[in-house]
């Protein structure tokens, strides 16, 4: 929370994971990544086996995410709460994107398990801003 406060940016995550450590990467303008490291291991491992929640500044995040569903192999649908939209590409189902009508962000949920990534993105209580 202290790191996010110093950034002065809105950052989303999937909440705490028991025994995990976290890294925050804000090197790219408009993109902030929260990486989950189970048991604090894997900090130098760049393989795609760790959960990552990315927050992208996107003025039209909702419209862009909805429109992405029209791309080849794209799938988009409204979240159960009615305010958000979820998108993923069938070729990369471990990367799921979500956005809300009233927020200038697109949020990416990456998990090594495609089912977990989709479930997390679709759960209105799971992906939250760090406060």
Placement of each model-derived feature along the sequence:
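Short, solvent-exposed recognition patches
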Residues: 1-94
């Amino acid at each position: 929370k202290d790191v996010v406060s110093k950034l002065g940016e809105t950052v989303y995550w999937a909440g705490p994971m028991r025994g995990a450590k976290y890294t925050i990467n804000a090197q790219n303008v408009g993109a902030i990544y929260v990486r989950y490291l189970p048991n604090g291991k894997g900090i130098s491992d760049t393989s795609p086996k760790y959960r990552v929640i990315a927050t992208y500044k996107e003025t039209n995040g909702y419209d862009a995410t909805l429109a992405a569903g029209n791309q080849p192999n794209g799938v988009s649908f409204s979240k159960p709460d009615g305010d958000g939209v979820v998108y993923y590409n069938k070729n990369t189902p471990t990367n799921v994107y979500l956005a809300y009508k009233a927020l200038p962000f697109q949020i990416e949920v990456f998990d090594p398990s495609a089912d977990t990534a989709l479930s997390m993105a679709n759960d209105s209580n799971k992906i939250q801003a760090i406060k």
